[in-house]
Amino acid sequence: MASPAPRSLSSSSSSSSSSFCPSISPPPRSPSRASLPFSVKCNTVEPLKLVNGKPSVPILDEQSLPKFLHSKRLESSVNRSNTRLKLFSGLANPALAKEVAWYMGLELGKVKIKRFADGEIYVQLEESVRGCDVFIIQPTSPPANENLMELLIMIDACRRASAKNITAVIPYFGYARADRKTQGRESIAAKLVANLITEAGANRVLACDLHSGQSMGYFDIPVDHVYCQPVILDYLASKGIASSDLVVVSPDVGGVARARAFAKKLSDAPLAIVDKRRHAHNVAEVMNLIGDVKGKVAVMLDDMIDTAGTITKGAELLHEEGAREVYACCTHAVFSPPAIERLSSGCFQEVIITNTLPVAEKNFFRQLTVLSTANLLGETIWRVHDDSSVSSIFQ
């Protein structure tokens, strides 16, 4: 019997090898990088600048190691060429993966990722991972289903190639908001996704600022929760705002614990809460403000900004209550329409986000500042690989 004809690959297929993101090139690694001072402030957190008319996101350089990271592991191991640690990136956020690899002094592993003409995903590792400690950097960001499936197939490929350990590094964990039933006959999709990642062959998950703490319990494998607050705190501290002028605001009751912890680290600033009622998905109505913001610089903190309805209505209320300036801070910038229109409408002095999700050029606006989490993720990966403490990074 004749063998079946091979399926054709779509013309839009792409590869996540070292050439997949030509627009953002990491600086060359220096053999003396391990001896750099760690007291220098992070300078990757400047607002976006225009280069030849196009927005440019600052990338890591030799002076960009944030002060809260003091890695003895980096000093002793960053230049080891015989490490059994392998970093791979999916196609969801290759720029972040490149920055993480640069910080760690490693090259991204070579992997071919393509799409068949019918939309199916093809993954082939182009180097051996046998006996290696493999870390796959792939946020399950929009399009969530496609990026999730790509992650699962990459995990499966590593497992079948005899990797010793496989860690799924998920800067943004899609479906995290579907963490409980709010009505009858609903799915708990966060638990389902956790099961899929586990069954695919992952031994560990590393995730940034999960929407709710209980999501960690949905996994039957260890989960390292990376808190990105130090990155934002470091940036706010560099702005020189008087501590007596600050107030941290939670945009809803569910984020009070997060905002309280943030306020304590931000010069023990006072806390305010926006009480709102949600009548439908992606629709929020601001009802009341608990706390005093008159004449203050209000820092609104949330784990993510999706349509920006909650945080924008909260900012409007803060201005009505006499706030001098309002800053919006979040880890995950989902930016579903009409988020950009709302955020750039003038309610915010600055919108501070991180690069756990890639931000399309069309979504850049004047008040936007993008902070890099690459140092934090790279340090966490080293410590997981070394069986060292991760929680000590955030103490």
From Swiss-Prot:
GO function terms (MF aspect): ATP binding; kinase activity; magnesium ion binding; ribose phosphate diphosphokinase activity
Entry annotated with the keyword Kinase: yes
Region annotated Binding of phosphoribosylpyrophosphate, chain positions: 295-310
Any one of the GO CC terms: chloroplast
Enzyme Commission no: 2.7.6.1
Subcellular location: Plastid, Chloroplast
NCBIfam families named among the record's database cross-references: PRK01259.1 (NF002320), PRK02812.1 (NF002758), ribP_PPkin (TIGR01251)
The name this protein goes by in its record: Ribose-phosphate pyrophosphokinase 2, chloroplastic
Lineage: Eukaryota, Viridiplantae, Streptophyta, Embryophyta, Tracheophyta
